[in-house]
Amino acid sequence: MLLSRTADSMYWMARYIERAESVARLLDVGRRMSSLVPDPDDASSEWTSTIEAAGCEASFAETHGTPTASNVIDHLVRDVRNPSSIFACLATVRQNARAVRTALSQDVWDAVNGMWIESQEWRDEDFTVEGLPRVLDWVK
């Protein structure tokens, strides 16, 4: 029988994996929509919609101001001050997995830990409009 703390950590581990995937899908849609606009400087409404759909308007406004491709990508992928960013979600997944490591199979722990290690190897060029699809496909 699982202790409530163990069950809680496992639930949130799965929930944050799901949240990271949802943010990746939102970013992919925003990227595709912005690519349909002939002038990249006119694509701010697509990126604004992405921030709104992610529910991050307040945290985004505090740190970035006007939505552009680069600052929306930064906020939703690697800004750890944003609890809904992909990096923050992956960190929380790993933290919850570490808390209940003895209750996880070795395969699950290896997958979670490997996911975290691989995400730490991403480079700055992975967080551009051109490099983003590879990262988003990996997350999804």
Listing of model-derived features with the role each one plays in the protein:
Residues 1-140:
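Alpha-helical transmembrane segments and their helix-helix packing motifs
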